[in-house]
From Swiss-Prot:
Its EC number is 5.1.1.3. The active site is at residues 73, 180. Substrate binds at residues 10-11, 42-43, 74-75, 181-182. This is Glutamate racemase.
Length: 265
């Protein structure tokens, strides 16, 4: 096992929001990122399929001898956390518990994929930590395909956001959890559509904090995002590496080198 080699995985671009939060907090740490772009999105798949995919992806990260697996994908975290724990051969850090720990209000909305919503994983985690909370989960099937297309200013994306937020606003939620790692890219749009008083919770921030003890960064950890380089990061995808690199550039602020990695189908 390589010391402090973090392994991240997601169905595509979304997990880069988690990676970026970690790098901004801890600097340029060695990591491997696997985007399963051949099978994106995960959130519209059946639970058994998601669990099978999680076993394959986490098994591949284990073979890379990572020291910690970061489930940078809410759908697999919701439906296959036990699979990841069994396959990783290393500690596993997920998003859902991190998000629940960040909740500070009683009326909570969750935007997530259909599979994550169907699992009720966010509701269970938030209610366990905050008894008496009202949790409303909203499935957002159109978000990931629209985000992966790369057009963050499309009318279709705005219309989808308005439709998905409507039941949460009707319930007067005080905070909204971004229950998919693609969704932080929607924060500028969501802020336009939400009252200023509604807090937006990005679970990736909680994951970056959980890694404090793992990485043991020297000196105090600044709350201000620090500059980082991608030189110590290896990026792999299961389809279209050039397209992924192009679409990932605005997410990371720099273009990653991306290689093709085939997995069992």
């Amino acid at each position: 096992m390589t010391p402090q080699l973090l392994g991240f995985f997601d169905s595509g671009l979304g997990g880069l929001t988690v990676l970026r939060r970690v790098l901004e907090r801890h600097g340029s740490v060695p990591c491997v990122y696997l985007g399963d772009t051949a099978r994106v999105p995960y959130g519209n798949r059946q639970p058994d399929d998601i669990r099978r995919i999680a076993a394959e992806v986490v098994g591949w990260l284990r073979d890379q001898k990572v020291s910690t697996v970061v489930m940078a994908c809410n759908t697999t975290n919701a439906l296959a956390r036990d699979v990841a724990d069994g396959q990783a051969g290393a500690p596993v850090i997920g998003l859902i518990g991190a998000a629940a720990a960040m909740v500070e209000t009683r009326r909570v909305g969750v935007l997530a994929t259909p599979a994550t919503v169907a699992s009720s994983a966010y509701r269970a985690s938030i209610e366990a930590l905050h008894p008496g909370s009202m949790v409303i989960e909203q499935a957002c099937p159109a978000f990931v395909p629209l985000i992966e297309s790369g057009d963050m200013n499309s009318d279709d994306l705005r219309r989808a956001a308005q439709a998905y937020l409507e039941p949460l606003l009707a319930a007067s939620v005080e905070s909204i959890v971004l229950g998919c790692t693609h969704y932080p890219l929607l924060v500028p749009l969501l802020r336009q559509l939400l009252p200023e008083s509604v807090q937006i919770i990005d679970p990736a921030i909680g994951v970056a904090r959980q890694l404090d003890a793992v990485l043991r960064s020297p000196g105090p950890i600044s709350a201000v995002p620090r500059p980082f380089s991608l030189e110590s990061c290896r990026f792999c995808v299961t389809a279209d590496p050039d397209g992924f690199a192009m679409r990932a550039t605005p997410w990371l602020g720099q273009r990653p080198d991306v290689s093709l990695q085939l997995l069992p189908d």
